[in-house]
Structure formats: C-alpha cells, structure tokens
Amino acid sequence: MKRLGTILALLMALAHPAWAQADFDSQAKFAILMDHETGTVLYQKDADLPMEPASMAKLMTLAVVFNEIANGRLALTDELYVSENAWRTGGAASGGSTMFAELNSTIAVEDLVRSVIIQSGNDAAIVLAEGIAGTEATFAAMMNELALDIGLTDSHFTNATGLPDPEMLVTARDLADLGRYLIRTYPQYYHYFSEPEMEWNGINQPNRNSLIEVGIGVDGLKTGHTETAGYGSVISTDAGGRRLVAVVHGLASMRERAEEGRKLITWGARAFERVAAYADNAIVAYADVFGGESGSVGLVGNGEIALYLPRGSRRCLSAEVHYVGPLMPPVMAGDQIAELQVFCDDRLVQVAPLYAAQSVAEGGIMRKATDALRQLALGWL
C-alpha cells in the first residue's frame, strides 16, 4: 500500500470529528446526521446499534421497486392485484397505516408507490411485494440482496411494511445511507416524497412527514412508528443548496419526532459549510506505474472534491493518498485506483475515491528494464 503524505494548502479547517457531540445533543435514542454529497457524519448517537425500523423499512421496499423499474421488469403504469393477504394484513381491517385498497381490485404501481411514501400504506407495500416477487417472503429476500449491494451491512429485512418482527433490525447509519442511495440513484422519483397529501378510495390523507410543511427545506423521506420502537424518521432537507440526511428514532410522540428532527437538521445547516477542496479534473496526486509508457498517472476526483466543515474554523487539514502500487499497465482513464483520506489532527474524517486522469499503456522492453533496475536499487518511494 502506497501512502503519499501531503498538506492541503486550503487555508481552512476541519475540527475534530467529535465536534458535533460537543455542540449538540439529540433526545432521540438513535440519531445520525450526514452530508448527502460527501457522506461526512456531522452528528451521531448510537448510530450503529440495532433498532426496529418500523415503517422506515419501506424505503428499502421502494429501493427494490425502483430497481425493478430501472431493469425493465416493472413499469409505473403496471396494474397490480390486491390479494386477500394484502387487504387483511395491511388494509383497513388491520388497524395500521393503510391506503384503503379494495380487495380484488388492481392498482397502478405509481399509485402504490405514492401511497407507500405519503400514506405509509401497509397494503400498498404488500401489493407491490406480491406483484413483484409472488410472496412477501420472497420480496424480503430481494430487499436483503439489494441492501448488501448498496452496502447496508448491518440491516436485515423480513417484510415490506416494517410491521414488527424480532428478526428485522437496522441501524440509523444504514437508514441514512439508504436515503442517500435513493436520492442519488433515483432522482426522477424524488418528487413523490414532498407531496403534501394523497386521496384514494374517497379518503384524503396528509403526508405523515409533517416537516415538509414547515418551510425549513425538508422534502423527504419517511416516518415510522410502532409501540415497541417508538417514533422515528428519515429526513432529507435542502439546506441552502447543501443537502443533509438525518435519522432520529426511539422518540415518544409525533410531536417529539418532528421537533427533534427539526432541531438536528437546523443545527447542521447552521453549524457547517461546504468547501471545495479540489476543482473538477484537478490533479490531486500522482501514482507510480511500473513498466508503462509513463512512469506515473495523475489522480482526480469524480468531479469536484468537496469537504463539509464546521463553520468558522481556521485550522489546517492534512490528507494522504492511498493506493496499492506500483500500478501495472494498462491503466485506463477513469479507473478507480486510489483514495484521498482527509484527517483532522490524527483522526480520519472523510474519504474520497480517486481515478486515473488518463490512460497509461504498457511500455517497451527498455522501459520495463529501467523500472526493474530502479525497483531493485531504490524501491518504490
């Protein structure tokens, strides 16, 4: 592993990553606040402990639905059948959050998606699961497979609704990452999350995320509640052009859920600022190439590399570029070959992938011989 140490001459600062805990405390049992763009964690409280997801599990249901649409196996206009299981388990007779779907009717996928988001319809979630996979259990297996692909390594799903099951557990960190995944991967569907209400079967229901109506930039994502888990929410907000994603869970009431969510995102928007570290296509460092037409290759970010910093800090940042090297040709432009690790003091606070700025073809015999002699004499510095 090669490590290239460098000091970022940015004349800016990054406080110790524990700054958030010193300046803010949430009453939620579990909480996390992330910068959507960089994934920087601005605040966390027991974010890696297992918790019951309640209806926030429906975000994973939506991820599978959107993935099926993206792969051509489902369309928003497809009509799905309302089975007796969906009607009894998630419908009006269940006593839980429901779309009030009629037994034996068919409903368009788009309406089911809107119901899952706005009304938290358990019947809508089950209809989607059965329509896609045949059974909810098979659909849950699809949820877990996609969750692992996304990188949600500490979560396990057993149903499409979030109804209580002792084997269904997630973490606040995984829910925040899931929210970021949905925003990043499926922006064409994001507008559903901010719809204020939905009417179905003659019954009008408001969006259960009350924060979308209070004028603080919240436009998603999903609330949840069970008697055992308490009240929780995955929140997304546009904070003056910077998007934040938050999770609060384990609260005692809807009012407390809304208040703790509002406090967390408002604090994050005021306490931190976005700073551009490297412009798009700017060379961050160079990586050695053994036996190539060129002895090194420039490393760039995937667009601009930005940092999310405490507002008003003025301490210097340090950074290191890490890669397994020397690299062997051919190296193709755009290959991910390194990562930029940003530190505050000695603590890692952000990681950004780095890519080859240009291609490097295999060199001739003389070039390989020269590199071999250099390696024998000096090693790769």
Regions found by a protein language model. Give the residues of each.
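Bacterial Sec-dependent signal peptides at the C-terminal "C-region" and cleavage site
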Residues: 15-22, 355
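A general, composition-driven signal for non-globular sequence regions
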Residues: 10-11, 52, 100, 251
